[in-house]
Design a protein with these regions (language model features):
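Structured, active/binding-site neighborhoods that engage oxygen-rich ligands
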Residues: 1-294
Length: 294
């Protein structure tokens, strides 16, 4: 989720005053977190602490009513009267990264992404934007390859839709434009930093495109440690606490997956004889003697 936050912070000062300079200063004194970060933290908090997505978004957005760049007009009304309003805005995609990072199968990622969107952005395109973004993050995280992004683009979007993405510098705040654009920008990237620079210097809704691309880039490349440290200096303590809890959860999940892999039985086939035997988890693969438990 910190990838989305970094993209948001880097793009914040250019949202209404675009830059096309690739070499812009990433962490400038004029930068700050925007509504994209507040909503991303809210989704993470909901997952980590068993809250509903609606209640967590309402809680965090009321707590931070005036972030840099402000909330959209319809979403402001939603904060104080949380009834879905059929939006297809890119807010559904910019806040969904915790879903793609925390859940571990496609079905759950799809379902939870839809749930995060439906509370406000209940238009089919809003839901689709959230699902596509979360699925891309999930597959980038698990496969560490660009191929899933290419497959997602061809599966969810027609050629006509892909040729209709926003031009450089064109304002676009809907999912059907911003999400495929973000996926394409990632495909052109070579590193986390390069992805952020490409996103922000493309212009348009620079903080939100930065947030979406940042969330994708985090899943594929990881984040440089100095970027993490700099980004955290812009955030209040309660947001840092959620991020810390999120990172600890990711670490625990990763270690658990490693443990399960070590403890799993698996089959080994002899290439000469073609015979297959099962290696038990409690067995040393090298000398095939039982491992003594301490």
């Amino acid at each position: 989720m910190l990838g989305a936050i970094i993209g948001d912070i880097a793009g914040s000062r250019f949202e209404f005053r675009n830059t096309f300079d690739y070499d812009f200063e990433l962490f400038h004194k004029e930068c700050d977190y925007t509504d994209d970060t507040v909503c991303t933290v809210a989704i993470a908090d909901a997952i980590l602490n068993g809250k509903s997505y609606e209640s967590s978004l309402v809680e965090w957005c009321r707590k931070y009513p005036n972030p840099m760049g402000a909330y959209g007009g319809s979403f402001v009304r939603w904060i104080y009267n949380p009834v879905p309003y059929g939006s297809w805005g890119n807010g559904a995609a910019m806040r969904v990264s915790p879903v793609g990072l925390l859940f571990n199968n496609e079905e759950t990622v799809r379902r939870e992404a839809e749930r995060t969107a439906k509370v406000s952005h209940s238009h089919p395109e809003g839901i689709k934007g959230a699902q596509v973004t979360a699925l891309a993050i999930f597959y980038l995280r698990t496969m560490k390859s660009m191929k899933p992004v290419e497959n997602i683009l061809s599966t969810f979007y027609t050629k006509e839709e892909l040729t209709a993405i926003p031009e450089k510098g064109e304002w676009c705040d809907n999912c059907q434009g911003c999400v495929p654009l973000s996926l394409m920008l990632l495909l052109q990237s070579t590193s986390f930093e390069d992805a952020i620079r490409r996103a922000v210097s493309y212009g348009g809704d620079s903080d939100t495109v930065g947030a979406i691309v940042g969330s994708l880039a985090e899943a594929l490349y990881g984040i440089p440690e100095d970027f993490k440290e700099k980004a955290l200096t812009y955030l209040p303590n309660d947001m840092k606490e959620v991020i810390h809890m999120f990172n600890q959860t990711i670490f625990t999940m990763t270690e658990e997956r490693k443990r399960r892999f070590r403890e799993a039985d698996f089959a080994v086939t002899n290439p000469k004889t073609g015979k297959t035997r099962v290696i038990k988890a409690s067995q040393d693969i090298t000398n095939r003697k039982p491992i003594k438990k301490k």
